[in-house]
Amino acid sequence: METGITIFVNGENRSAKSGASVADLLRELGLDSGRVAIERNLEILPRPQWAQTLVASGDRYEIVQFVGGG
């Protein structure tokens, strides 16, 4: 049975599934993983660690999306 946990994304309170990875979180948020950078608890989280890093209750994420243009 999966339980919900509370995390913060860009300063907002959100629910996440217990046992979800950061990559799962991005998919749930509908974000293109190729165009974002993630800070977890005040530290940059390298892209190769996204699939192995599990979200934990109380985690604070800042997710920045890159936008192209001219």
Protein language model annotation of sequence segments:
Residues 1-69:
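Ubiquitin-like/PB1-type beta-grasp interaction modules and other compact soluble beta-rich domains
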